[in-house]
């Protein structure tokens, strides 16, 4: 039986690969997509998500979400993904539109209609998920678990200790991590290992139309290079759903720092139990890189 999932995303070049995997992995049933401001503005992430759905002729409803973080000014990662968020490929025009309700309400409504609890996957800032949990707490029993790409047990990528998705809205992340729902965190500890090699990247233009499109996007992606390999951060969250045996998980207490002058957005991961607090997150700490690369090749070969 296919696993029903809802995907909250901020496309983003590596988001595009994650969306492809969510659509084409035969083990998954992508039922709803929502967008959030993150890599670029929410207007751009929504446009990019709709372009991808049209490219793959995927009839999946999409709702536009939060334009700004809960309490602080927005930040973006245009330096990594380009000003549009998906520079490098000319998508054809379409007339698709997002749903007429905010993302968190679309998630609420879809959860309440679902015949069984649904897995949420969040690969951008956690603003929409925090709004859902704070404004619609009655939804919690309908969430099977939340798998996120975000955080780090060690070094960051936008400050010395903070990962971008968490640092973009620390208050939202703190709300989510305190919520009591089951959470799996795929942070930089594994995503920095999730590299597509130059040899594989060179094969993409001849793979299929998706490979050709992704290769064009990758030439504008600044998380690595075509010569040294590219990090597929967001794709790890999808891989964990399909191939959990590739990941080493450890239950830990995780809190999000929201006040520190130099540490705001840091995920404080208590690996050794120093704080004596019960674990609230399963943290991915290691990745079978070869197995991950093999799975990526398999799923992208299906994305025609």
UniProtKB/Swiss-Prot annotation:
Pfam families in UniProt: IU_nuc_hydro
UniProt-listed GO biological process terms: purine nucleobase metabolic process; purine nucleoside catabolic process; pyrimidine nucleobase metabolic process
Active-site residues from the entry: 233
Leading EC class: hydrolase
Residues in the signal sequence: none
Matches recorded under InterPro entries: I/U_nuclsd_hydro_CS (IPR015910), Inosine/uridine_hydrolase_dom (IPR001910), IUNH (IPR023186), Nucleosid_hydro_RihC_nonspecif (IPR022976), Ribo_hydro-like (IPR036452)
EC numbers on record: 3.2.-.-
Superkingdom to which the source organism belongs: Bacteria
SUPFAM superfamilies assigned to the protein according to its UniProt record, in alphabetical order: Nucleoside hydrolase
GO-annotated molecular function: purine nucleosidase activity; uridine nucleosidase activity
Keyword set, alphabetical order: Glycosidase, Hydrolase
GO cellular component term, pick one: cytosol
Family stated for the protein in its record: Belongs to the IUNH family. RihC subfamily.
Family matches, as HAMAP family: Nucleosid_hydro_RihC
Functional note: Hydrolyzes both purine and pyrimidine ribonucleosides with a broad-substrate specificity.
Stated name of the protein: Non-specific ribonucleoside hydrolase RihC
Annotated organism of origin: Shigella boydii serotype 18 (strain CDC 3083-94 / BS512)
């Amino acid at each position: 039986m296919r696993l029903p999932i809802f995907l909250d995303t901020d496309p983003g070049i590596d988001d595009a690969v994650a969306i492809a995997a969510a659509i084409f992995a035969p083990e998954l049933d992508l039922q709803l997509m929502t967008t959030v401001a993150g890599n670029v503005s929410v207007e751009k992430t929504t446009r990019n998500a709709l372009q991808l759905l049209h490219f793959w002729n995927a009839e999946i409803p999409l709702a536009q979400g939060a334009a700004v973080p809960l309490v602080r000014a927005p930040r973006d990662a245009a330096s990594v993904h380009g000003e549009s968020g998906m520079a490098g490929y000319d998508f054809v025009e379409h007339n698709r539109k997002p749903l007429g309700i905010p993302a968190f309400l679309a998630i609420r409504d879809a959860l309440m209609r679902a015949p069984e609890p649904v897995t949420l996957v969040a690969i951008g800032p956690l603003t929409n998920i925090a709004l859902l949990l704070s404004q619609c707490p009655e939804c919690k029993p309908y969430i099977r678990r939340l798998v996120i790409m975000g955080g780090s047990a060690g070094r960051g990528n936008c400050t010395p200790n903070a990962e971008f998705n968490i640092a973009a809205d620390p208050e939202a992340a703190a709300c989510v991590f305190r919520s009591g729902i089951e959470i799996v965190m795929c942070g930089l500890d594994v995503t920095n290992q999730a590299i597509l090699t130059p040899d594989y990247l060179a094969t993409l233009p001849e793979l299929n139309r998706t490979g050709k499109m992704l290769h064009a996007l990758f030439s504008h992606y600044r998380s690595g290079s075509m010569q040294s390999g590219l990090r597929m951060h967001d794709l790890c969250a999808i891989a964990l759903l399909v191939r959990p045996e590739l990941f080493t998980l450890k239950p830990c207490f995780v809190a999000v720092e929201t006040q520190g002058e130099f540490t705001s957005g840091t995920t404080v991961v208590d690996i050794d139990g120093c704080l004596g607090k019960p674990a609230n997150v399963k943290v991915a700490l290691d990745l079978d890189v070869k197995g991950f690369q093999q799975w990526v090749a398999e799923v992208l070969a299906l994305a025609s």
